[in-house]
């Protein structure tokens, strides 16, 4: 379930997301909240669930402030993630509450983490213990990776342990809901190279968790991850550009060599190319994980850690009781000098013991623990991680105290004795923890860790004890407060007796067990409150990288939107152009058809008009010809009549002869008229044939002209469309180049900002280290005069003792010499011996003065030499880290330039390919247009030839028919000969 995009953090409109949260008051359900750790989002608390009667861990996450939206989205992601995953080796999700601007994420309570164990025990784990923890962790990772999820923050601080020796994977605030991912997130020392370079080189997969697991194995084996002596920011650069880390060489006299399976397991987990690493399933099947081991390995490890925590807390309690008792006794005696000496002696022993452990190791261990807690999101709420400074101070302080008391006997003898009942009570196995100085001032309750029962006894659960057990515990607490496993805070010592008993019963009922001492928790809080530390720097750096990634995503979305808008615009332009051209084609073709129809109609009308005119002319000529023939007929008839009359023929014969003459004349007249009519008809037909041929030729020319115009229109439209496509290609090219330039400018700006942040962080780290070293040297310089005075006093004391011894010896020697010399020489001898004695004492004084000067000079030179060596080592270390940073920045800058060059080349190739394809398409369409023009012309020529052939055939058939029929009227049945031909 992806986080919803909300207008205001804390306001939920999606019912599916609202179902994840409860608006009830969590303070009414959970009681006895006590802080047990700090995370990057807030604090983690132990609490008691009154409804379900069980102990839980509550992670309070505030989502107010400048980054409220980002915090709220992260909360939604983590809550949604935990609500969807269920696995025996993943911390159980209980509930989630919203109270004002704080989210209460309730999960199962675990007693500590794997990091707590190595910090408390102050040594690495054995292989069998590492394998047991990794086996259950890999089981959880297999489940996550099968869901295409990436944890992205695997480390010992996020591998929790329950009181039943079950490993629980926690802290999903950095988890990714998709695989692959592309976000810079995680703890620096455990981040895979591809995660560090996520924004520069692309995405990463679930193999990033395998790298973190390999680093975690080294952490469990060596107490701290590789490169931990470096600045956290410098570690990022080192991981990104150097070879993978390996196990450090070990002293075989103290522990056995690492097995080949373990070395190979880490080697396969820490392959720099992600594809060469094992998957979670392959890791789980590795011989190192699958080899046999005792079933109670983790339980025994937890028990040893609990015992150590108990000893450390008891030591803190003893130290506080002794300091309080000594202050009271020295105040009564009023011996200010002795009190100062005793206090100096006590703290001096402690300081010496801690100094033997090594200041650098202690401070680095403290930073490791605090860094673990700060980088985690408070996972499971459970013990986020451990600060080892308290553990180291406690252990060394304990051993140092014993040694110190034997080495400073004179000081110890001046101390008043500590009552035996106090020593006996504080050494009882059931004694609980006592808060350190900070915890007393803050009135924080510290609860002891109850020893884990033996295998024969049932494993304690988080269920409350019975009433009988509670009553017996109350009685014990009332009878002997120092012999209980629970100790009330200082402020509770003044509570009413009944209230104290109720509080003790409540605390006993909750069974608060942890693998961390109270001093560790207090120091973790102090580390968290420091300003400008590496945690804040890393947080700012992560936010910067994530902000850059978010800005890039938004830019890519905007570019995609611009490209889509341009595509829609170009498609719309093409569609509009196509529609316009289709309409234009239809209009042109309609106009051409109309013109053809008009021309055909004009041809028909012209033919009809010509026929009508010609017929009228023929009729007129026929009338004239008939009249002429009639005149000729009359003339011939009169001539014949005159001729016959001249013959004086009988009337009947005359009449018969006249009839024959008239008949002959009529036949001649009719024959001539018929011939003339045939002539006129032939002339008309010839005229019609000429007209039709001429009009058909004109019509064909018109059709060819119109067809050429149609092809020209199509060609013009094609050229216009090609111009539009070229313009759109240029628009697309300009937009892509603009986007690429903006992207490159943004990446360069991001890189410069990132480099500035990295350089500023390195400078701050350098300044902080130099300031700390200067403070340390200043402290040593301020401490040196007191140390020199003490040693000078010791030398002078030795001098006085030697002088006293020599004086006694001189007196004895003088007495002996006086007794053996005469009395008159005694005075002279005494004077000479006294003079010799004075010279010896003066020489001895000179020697002691020289010894003091030499001691002061040696100490000063030695201190200065130490300080110079420390300054030189620190300068070399910081210079090396700065060089690595510069090299890393040069590499990233070169990588970016190479990437920019590749992207520009790729874009130019894409643009060139598109341009070539467009030009090829234009050429092909033009060739198709030319081919279409040629084919159309051929088709028109063929059609016109066929039409002319049909017309001639029609003329032939019509002419033969007319001649055969003879009596058909002119023009009848021939008016549609052109249409028939077409």
Swiss-Prot record:
Record's GO cellular component terms: cell cortex; cytoplasm; cytoskeleton
Superkingdom as given in the UniProt entry: Eukaryota
Entry keyword set: ATP-binding, Cytoplasm, Cytoskeleton, Kinase, Magnesium, Metal-binding, Nucleotide-binding, Serine/threonine-protein kinase, Transferase
Any one GO BP annotation for this protein: MAPK cascade
Main location: cytoplasm
Matches recorded under InterPro entries: Kinase-like_dom_sf, Prot_kinase_dom, Protein_kinase_ATP_BS, TAO_STE20_kinase
Disrupted-gene phenotype: RNAi-mediated knockdown leads to embryonic lethality. Increased and prolonged cortical contractility leading to a more persistent pseudocleavage in surviving embryos. Decrease in rho-1 anterior cortex localization and increase in posterior cortex localization, leading to a loss of asymmetric rho-1 cortex localization during early embryonic cell division. Increased cortical nmy-2 network between the foci, suggesting that the enhanced contractions are due to increased actomyosin contractility.
Compositionally biased spans, kind Low complexity: 353-373, 459-472, 957-967
Classification via Gene3D superfamilies: Phosphorylase Kinase, domain 1, Transferase(Phosphotransferase) domain 1
Residues given in the record as ATP binding sites: 36-44, 59
Tissues in which the UniProt entry reports expression: Expressed in the pharynx, including the pharyngeal muscle of the metacorpus, the isthmus, and the terminal bulb; in the intestine, including the pharyngeointestinal valve between the pharynx and the intestine, a structure near the anus likely to be the anal sphincter and the excretory cell and in several ring neurons.
Protein kinase domain residues: 30-289
Alphabetized GO MF terms: ATP binding; metal ion binding; protein serine kinase activity; protein serine/threonine kinase activity
Top-level class of the enzyme under EC nomenclature: transferase
Cofactor(s) needed: Mg(2+)
Known EC number: 2.7.11.1
Biased composition (Polar residues): 421-431, 759-768, 973-982
Compartments, as annotated in UniProt: Cytoplasm, Cytoskeleton; Cytoplasm, Cell cortex
Active-site residues from the entry: 153
Catalytically driven reaction(s): L-seryl-[protein] + ATP = O-phospho-L-seryl-[protein] + ADP + H(+); L-threonyl-[protein] + ATP = O-phospho-L-threonyl-[protein] + ADP + H(+)
Function (record text): Acts as a negative regulator of cortical contractions during early embryonic cell division, possibly by regulating rho-1-dependent actomyosin contractility. Plays a role in polarity establishment in early embryos by regulating the size of the anterior and posterior cortex in the first asymmetric cell division. Might play a role in cell cycle progression. In the germline, involved in the regulation of meiotic progression during oogenesis, possibly by modulating the timing of mpk-1 activation. Plays a role in meiotic recombination events. Involved in pharyngeal pumping.
Protein name per Swiss-Prot or TrEMBL: Serine/threonine-protein kinase SULU
Organism: Caenorhabditis elegans
Taxonomic lineage of the native organism: Eukaryota, Metazoa, Ecdysozoa, Nematoda, Chromadorea
Gene giving rise to this polypeptide: kin-18
């Amino acid at each position: 379930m992806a986080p919803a995009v909300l207008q205001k953090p804390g306001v939920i409109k999606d019912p599916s997301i609202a179902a994840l949260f409860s608006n009830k008051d969590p303070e009414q359900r959970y009681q006895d909240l006590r802080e047990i750790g700090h995370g990057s989002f807030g604090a983690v608390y132990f609490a008691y669930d009154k409804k379900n009667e069980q102990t839980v861990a509550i992670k309070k996450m505030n989502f107010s402030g400048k980054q409220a939206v980002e915090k709220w989205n992260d909360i939604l992601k983590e809550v949604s993630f935990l609500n969807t995953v269920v696995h025996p080796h993943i911390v159980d999700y209980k509930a989630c509450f919203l109270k004002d601007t704080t989210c209460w994420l309730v999960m199962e309570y675990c007693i500590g983490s794997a990091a707590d164990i190595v910090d408390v025990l102050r040594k690495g784990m054995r292989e069998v213990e590492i394998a047991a923890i990794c086996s259950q962790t890999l089981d959880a990772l297999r489940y996550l990776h099968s869901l295409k999820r990436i944890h992205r923050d695997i480390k010992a601080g996020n591998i929790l342990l329950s009181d039943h020796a079950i490993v629980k994977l926690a802290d999903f605030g950095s988890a990714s809901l998709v695989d692959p991912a592309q976000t810079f997130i995680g703890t620096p020392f455990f981040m895979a190279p591809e995660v560090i370079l996520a924004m520069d080189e692309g995405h990463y997969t679930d193999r990033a968790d395998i790298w973190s697991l390999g680093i975690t194995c080294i952490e469990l084996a060596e107490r701290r991850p590789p490169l931990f002596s470096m600045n956290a920011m410098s570690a990022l650069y080192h991981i990104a550009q150097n070879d993978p880390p390996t196990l450090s060489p070990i002293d075989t006299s103290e522990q056995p060599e690492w097995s080949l399976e373990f070395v190979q397991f880490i080697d396969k987990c820490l392959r720099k190319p992600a594809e060469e690493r094992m998957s979670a399933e392959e890791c789980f099947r590795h011989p190192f994980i699958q080899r046999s081991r005792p079933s109670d390995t983790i339980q025994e490890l937890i028990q040893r850690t609990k015992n150590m925590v108990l000893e450390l807390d008891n030591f803190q309690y003893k130290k506080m009781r002794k300091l309080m008792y000594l202050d009271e006794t020295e105040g009564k005696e009023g011996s200010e000098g002795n009190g100062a000496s005793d206090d100096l002696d006590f703290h001096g022993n402690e300081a010496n013991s801690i100094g033997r452990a090594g200041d650098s190791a202690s401070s680095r261990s403290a930073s490791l623990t605090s860094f673990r807690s700060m980088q985690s999101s408070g996972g499971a709420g459970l013990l986020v991680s451990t600060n080892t400074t308290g553990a180291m101070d406690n252990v060394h302080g304990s051993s140092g105290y014993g040694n110190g008391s034997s080495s400073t006997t004179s000081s110890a003898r001046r101390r008043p004795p500590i009552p035996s009942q106090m020593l006996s009570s504080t050494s009882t196995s059931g004694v609980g923890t006592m808060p350190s100085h900070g915890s007393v001032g803050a009135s924080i309750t510290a609860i002891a860790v109850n020893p884990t029962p033996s295998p024969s006894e049932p494993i304690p659960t988080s269920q409350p004890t019975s009433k009988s057990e509670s009553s017996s515990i109350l009685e014990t607490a009332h009878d002997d407060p120092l012999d209980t496993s629970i100790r009330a805070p200082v402020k509770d010592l003044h509570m009413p007796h009944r209230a104290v008993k109720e509080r003790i019963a409540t605390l006993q009922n909750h069974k608060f067990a942890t693998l961390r001492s109270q001093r560790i928790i207090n120091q973790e809080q102090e580390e968290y409150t420091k300003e400008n530390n590496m945690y804040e720097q890393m947080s700012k750096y992560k936010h910067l990288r994530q902000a850059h990634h978010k800005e890039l995503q938004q830019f890519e979305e905007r570019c995609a939107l611009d490209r889509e808008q341009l595509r829609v615009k170009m498609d719309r332009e093409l569609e509009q152009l196509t529609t316009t051209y289709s309409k234009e084609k239809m209009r042109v073709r309609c106009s051409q058809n109309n013109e053809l129809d008009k021309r055909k109609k004009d041809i028909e009308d012209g033919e009809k008009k010509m026929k009508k005119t010609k017929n009228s002319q023929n009729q007129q000529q026929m009338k004239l010809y008939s009249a002429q023939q009639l005149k000729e007929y009359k003339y011939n008839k009169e001539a014949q009549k005159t001729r016959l009359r001249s013959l004086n023929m009988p009337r009947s014969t005359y009449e018969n002869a006249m009839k024959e003459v008239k008949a002959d004349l009529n036949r001649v007249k009719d024959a001539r008229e018929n011939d003339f009519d045939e002539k006129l008809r032939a002339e008309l037909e010839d005229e019609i044939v000429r007209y039709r041929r001429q009009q058909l030729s004109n019509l064909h020319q018109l059709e060819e002209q119109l067809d050429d115009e149609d092809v020209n229109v199509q060609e013009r439209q094609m050229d216009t469309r090609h111009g539009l496509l070229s313009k759109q290609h240029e628009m697309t090219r300009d937009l892509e180049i603009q986007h690429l330039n903006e992207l490159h400018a943004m990446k360069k700006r991001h890189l410069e900002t990132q480099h500035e942040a990295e350089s500023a962080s390195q400078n701050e780290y350098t300044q902080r280290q130099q300031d700390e070293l200067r403070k340390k040297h200043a402290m040593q310089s301020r401490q040196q005069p007191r140390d020199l005075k003490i040693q000078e006093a010791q030398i002078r004391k030795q001098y006085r003792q030697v002088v006293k011894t020599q004086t006694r010896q001189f007196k004895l020697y003088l007495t002996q010499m006086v007794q053996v010399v005469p009395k008159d020489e005694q005075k002279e001898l005494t004077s000479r011996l006294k003079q010799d004695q004075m010279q010896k004492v003066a020489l001895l004084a000179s020697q002691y003065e020289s010894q003091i000067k030499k001691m002061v000079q040696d100490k000063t030179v030695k201190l200065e030499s130490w300080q110079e060596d420390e300054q030189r080592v620190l300068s070399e270390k910081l210079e090396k880290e700065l060089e690595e940073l510069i090299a890393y920045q040069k590499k990233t800058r070169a990588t970016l330039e190479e990437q920019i060059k590749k992207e520009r080349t790729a874009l130019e190739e894409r643009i060139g390919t598109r341009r070539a394809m467009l030009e090829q398409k234009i050429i092909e369409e033009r060739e198709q247009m030319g081919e279409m023009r040629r084919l159309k012309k051929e088709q028109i020529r063929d059609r016109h030839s066929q039409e002319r052939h049909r017309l001639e055939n029609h003329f032939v058939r019509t002419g033969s028919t007319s001649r055969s029929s003879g009596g058909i009227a002119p023009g009848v049945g021939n008016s549609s000969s052109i249409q028939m031909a077409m």
